Amino acid sequence: MPGLTQRFLKNFTLFLLFSSTVFAKSGIVIFQSDFGYKDAAVSEVKGVIYSVDKSLIISDLTHDIPAYNIWEASYRLYQAAPYWPKASVFVSVVDPGVGTQRRSVVALTNNGLYFVTPDNGTLTLIDDAYGIKEVRLIDERKHRLKGSNNSYTFFGRDVYGYTAAKLAAGEISFAEVGPLSDKPIVKIPYQKPVIENNILRGTIVILDPKYGNIWTNIDENLINAYGMKAKGRYQVKIYHNQVQKYSDIISFHNTFGDTEKGANLLYLNSLLKLAIATNQGNFAKLHQLNAGPDWLITIEKL
């Protein structure tokens, strides 16, 4: 009996150890960067990923993030993340601090997605929207492309793409990425959507690059709480670094076809967030507006 008990305890301990080890093994890597397509950078990263496991699926989120624009990288991850299956591995390379002491991390969200990225603010909107369960520091002694130790300017290929591939292929567990972070992630401050003094306030988080519509972070629930109605008219003001750049009265509509060509309208975009457009025009270009954490918007009932 004592021998049987010891074997049981040993097996039970191994079971607990194995069951607490989290493997992604989704076989999916979603890749975004500010590299563009004019050189071989994107192809190099993909080559590294396929070299780890040829069966991996690589999806390009975008490689047209404006150079060094960490905020837009954060937004595009937030935009795409909810449509991917659990355990998918995102790798984001917008890394103006490459080769410095900024941290290289893998974050696991509460909804079971993995994000491989420099800890430079890229995780801001992922954390706010989905919550980050754990962050691990990438152990570069173990998870770095062979022969790249003297390369200091392409962590996207040598560390991030390589680590993402190993995680997605199930070659390493999340715990094997490296030690748990003992510091909070770097976050970019911005105006959260609120109703304050009977005014709806938020941030212009992104532009629709094709059509020039401006998208805010003001969601459908807050719009309903404020009492916005179809065909209602509202005073809209836009500020950049606290300087007013736009002011006009705009009507709220369900879709573009509810207005005449050239008319401005407030509407709910595909993410059910408040947006502004010019019907068959480019609102942002027309009014010289942009997006980011320093672009604020207010909506007020007439």
Segments from the language model and where they lie:
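A conserved acidic, glycine/proline-rich C-terminal tail/linker
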Residues: 214-289
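N-terminal signal-anchor module of multipass membrane proteins
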Residues: 30-37, 42-43
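N-terminal signal peptide c-region/cleavage motif recognized by signal peptidases
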Residues: 19-21
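Active-site histidine-anchored catalytic micro-motif
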Residues: 27-28, 40, 52-58, 68-75, ...
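A residue-level signal for conserved active-site and pocket-lining positions in enzyme catalytic cores
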Residues: 34, 163, 279
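Bacterial N-terminal signal peptides that target proteins for export
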Residues: 2-13
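Anionic-ligand-binding alpha/beta catalytic cores of soluble enzymes and soluble regulatory domains
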Residues: 148-230
